[in-house]
Amino acid sequence: APSMGFQGMR
């Protein structure tokens, strides 16, 4: 999974 997606969720 892309880290960018996780950061955007926060």
UniProtKB/Swiss-Prot annotation:
One of its GO terms (cellular component) is extracellular region. The keyword Zinc does not apply. It comes from the Eukaryota. It is found in: Secreted. The keyword Secreted applies. Brain. GO terms for biological process: neuropeptide signaling pathway. Myoactive peptide. Increases the amplitude and frequency of spontaneous contractions and tonus of hindgut muscle. This is Tachykinin-related peptide 9.
